[in-house]
């Protein structure tokens, strides 16, 4: 392991954060450490504890001019079996291959450290920078995400806080740091469908209504439906059934109902209302006695080429020499909440190959590269 004294400022901070076991929604004083550093750098701090979730908003600069916000989360997913790890998941070790190992190394304490060190350096080098540098940090991203970024954004919107650009530190890279940035995400619409039948004896089907038999053609049609064609930025909308439950456990009983859980990952070519109406039409066409509970996790958002994406892409090219690819693939992130403010949102972070896995790790030197990319982006937008 590399001695602590030999580590760069970014790696020192990343290790300090990883050593705090902040399994969602626990923050474990990660934000206290970050706020102390930002306060020392002249940032105005605003802690926002909402229910059992720690959040904070911090800003540095003028009230006039554009605002560049760094957003991220201090919470991490559970470790899984600790004995399966090569080292304690909260030890923050750098191995002989130069990999920083620990829960949160990639998702996303490495990014948090890079953001903070880049911002410290920027406000020192450019104390009279235009606009504002801001941070929006939560401990509720890996969990329900009700009282984290979503709730903070609602407060910021209520007081008409300006947010022009936002870099979310999610691990966007696939093979090399900066090779991919996310300039949007698909929407996520979940549903729990109940199809009601009539329970009975399997030997007397004329006295029962089998919800499995009734629902099967409708579910097959939903699975085969072509929802949209996507567009230049998004693939076509997808429909997936994740759970299907029916039956009493007995082999001689026709069940009384069937429950199917499904999810849409939808592009900007579809709307929530449109998808719901089309599902209802298919279920009605098959004459089902049905009920659906809908749950919208987030609407799709897209940041088209413009000031933020241009600055991030140019900084990646300047620091690494490579051209980045803008993508909307993958799951949802807190960017979906920030985008509701009309903010240009880009996700940029380290390689995501081991996120949420046992032995999560990231190339330690990548975090210093990421710091420089963030710093150069700050210069391009606010210097």
From Swiss-Prot:
Zn(2+) 2 binds at residues 107, 142, 356. The active site is at 75, 141 (proton acceptor). It catalyses: N-succinyl-(2S,6S)-2,6-diaminopimelate + H2O = (2S,6S)-2,6-diaminopimelate + succinate. Its cofactor is Zn(2+); Co(2+). Binds 2 Zn(2+) or Co(2+) ions per subunit. Its EC number is 3.5.1.18. It comes from the Bacteria. This is Succinyl-diaminopimelate desuccinylase. It comes from Pseudomonas fluorescens (strain ATCC BAA-477 / NRRL B-23932 / Pf-5).
């Amino acid at each position: 392991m590399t001695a602590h004294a030999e580590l760069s400022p970014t790696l020192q901070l990343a290790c300090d954060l990883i050593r705090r076991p902040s399994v969602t929604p626990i923050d474990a004083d990660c934000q206290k450490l970050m706020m102390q550093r930002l306060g020392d750098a002249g940032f105005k701090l605003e802690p926002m504890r909402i229910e059992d979730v720690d959040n904070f908003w911090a800003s540095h600069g003028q009230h006039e001019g554009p605002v560049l916000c760094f957003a991220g989360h201090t919470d991490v997913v559970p470790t899984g079996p600790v004995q399966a790890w090569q080292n304690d998941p909260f030890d923050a070790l750098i191995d002989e291959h130069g990999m920083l190992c620990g829960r949160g190394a990639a998702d996303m304490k490495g990014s948090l450290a890079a953001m903070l060190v880049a911002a410290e350096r920027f406000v020192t080098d450019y104390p009279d920078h235009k606009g504002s540098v801001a941070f929006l940090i939560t401990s509720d991203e890996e969990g329900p995400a009700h009282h984290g970024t979503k709730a903070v954004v609602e407060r910021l919107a209520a007081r008409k806080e300006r947010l022009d650009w936002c870099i979310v530190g999610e691990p966007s890279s696939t093979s090399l740091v900066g090779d991919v940035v996310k300039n949007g995400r698909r929407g996520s619409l979940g549903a729990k469908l109940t199809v009601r039948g009539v329970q009975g004896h399997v030997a007397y089907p004329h006295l029962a209504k089998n919800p499995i038999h009734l629902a099967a053609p409708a579910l097959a049609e939903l699975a085969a439906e072509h929802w949209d064609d996507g567009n230049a930025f998004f693939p076509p909308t997808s429909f997936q059934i994740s759970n299907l439950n029916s039956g009493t456990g007995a082999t001689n009983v026709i069940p009384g109902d069937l429950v199917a859980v499904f999810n849409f990952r939808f592009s900007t070519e579809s709307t929530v209302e449109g998808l719901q109406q089309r599902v209802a039409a298919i279920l009605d066409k098959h004459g089902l006695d049905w009920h659906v509970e809908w749950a919208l996790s987030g609407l799709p958002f897209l940041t088209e080429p413009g000031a933020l994406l241009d600055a991030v892409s140019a900084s990646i090219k300047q620091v690494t020499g490579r051209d980045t690819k803008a993508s909307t693939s993958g799951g949802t992130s807190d960017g979906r909440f920030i985008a509701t403010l009309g903010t240009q949102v880009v996700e940029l972070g380290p390689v995501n190959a081991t996120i949420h896995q046992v032995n999560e790790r990231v190339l330690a030197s990548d975090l210093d590269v990421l710091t420089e990319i963030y710093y150069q982006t700050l210069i391009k937008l606010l210097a």
